Every structure is written in structure tokens, then in C-alpha cells.
């Protein structure tokens, strides 16, 4: 019964989200809490960042939809939030924002025996990624890079 109601609720909330140019990434209903906690993770359909105001604006129509559906027959707390920041760096904005931060570079191993390199993000160009590894700048061609993620450096 719980799963069926959750699925129905998810369908209703996705319709509401579409009206606000939002997409629901996940809905988590924590019935082990008192009151029950309904957590909804949203993102914008155009890819822009979610603001606190976006979450607040979506709260009222989401709450209204939950109330009108009568699918939750208990008191609950509604939490609307964004996915947060991804650890993976993909956009030029990411590379500018996190310059100097520790990164983990996953390599494709075509030309290297190493799977990963760790260092501080130094520079990104169209052709290569440069990281600072213990004071030495290492340029890695992008055709050798699978993934670049934020990490914590260990000595």
C-alpha cells in the first residue's frame, strides 16, 4: 500500500513540478520519523542552479498537492531541496570556480598504466588539463581523461 501511494504521489508531484519548469529527481518518504518527513529533490529543466527561493516557491504547490491527494494520512514535514553540487567537474564554470582545489583525474589507460592522478586543479584548455602534483605542473591531454572530480588530498 505504501509503495502504491508513493508512486501515485510522485506522479502528481511531477505534474506540479512541470508547471514550474522543474524536474523531480527523487522523493523520499521517511515514515520512521515522527512526524513523517517527505523529502523532494528538484532541479530546473533548463539546467540552471536551484536557489533557496526556488525551493520555497515550490513548497506551497507541492504541499497543496499532497494535501489534496489524501495519500498521506498523517502529519508530515515537507523538505524541498536541490541535488547540491556534484563532485564531478564538467563545465568551464566548474573549472574556473574550483581552480586550486584538489582533484582526482581518472585516466583511460590507453597510454598510461596509472588509473588516477591526484593534484590541485591548475588549468583547463581546449586540449589538456593541467594539475599541480607536489609543485610540478602535469599537463594531461583530454583524450586520456575519463573523469575529473573534486576530492581531498592525502599526503
Swiss-Prot record:
Record keywords, A-Z: Cytoplasm, Ribosome biogenesis
Gene Ontology cellular component terms for the protein in this record: cytosol
Protein's UniProt keywords contain Cytoplasm: yes
InterPro entries given in the database record: Ribosome_maturation_RimP (IPR003728), RimP_C_sf (IPR036847), RimP_N (IPR028989), RimP_N_sf (IPR035956)
Domain of life: Bacteria
GO BP annotations listed: ribosomal small subunit assembly; translation
PANTHER family xref list: RIBOSOME MATURATION FACTOR RIMP (PTHR33867:SF1)
Function per UniProt: Required for maturation of 30S ribosomal subunits.
Family (UniProt): Belongs to the RimP family.
Name of the protein in its database record: Ribosome maturation factor RimP
Origin species: Prochlorococcus marinus (strain MIT 9215)
Highest classification ranks of the organism: Bacteria, Bacillati, Cyanobacteriota, Cyanophyceae, Synechococcales
Amino acid at each position: 500500500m505504501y509503495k502504491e501511494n508513493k508512486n501515485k504521489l510522485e506522479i502528481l508531484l511531477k505534474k506540479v513540478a512541470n508547471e514550474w519548469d522543474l524536474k523531480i529527481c527523487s522523493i523520499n518518504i521517511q515514515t520512521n520519523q515522527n512526524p513523517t518527513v517527505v523529502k523532494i529533490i528538484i532541479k530546473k529543466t533548463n539546467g540552471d542552479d536551484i536557489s533557496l527561493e526556488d525551493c520555497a516557491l515550490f513548497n506551497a504547490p507541492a504541499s497543496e498537492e499532497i494535501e489534496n491527494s489524501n495519500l498521506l494520512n498523517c502529519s508530515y514535514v515537507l523538505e524541498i531541496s536541490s541535488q547540491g553540487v556534484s563532485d564531478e567537474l564538467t563545465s568551464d564554470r566548474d573549472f574556473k570556480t574550483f581552480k586550486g582545489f584538489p582533484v582526482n583525474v581518472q585516466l583511460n589507460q590507453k597510454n598510461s598504466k596509472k588509473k588516477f592522478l591526484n593534484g590541485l586543479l591548475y588549468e583547463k584548455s581546449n586540449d589538456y588539463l593541467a594539475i599541480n602534483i607536489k609543485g610540478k605542473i602535469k599537463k594531461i591531454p583530454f583524450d586520456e581523461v575519463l573523469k575529473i572530480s573534486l576530492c581531498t588530498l592525502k599526503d
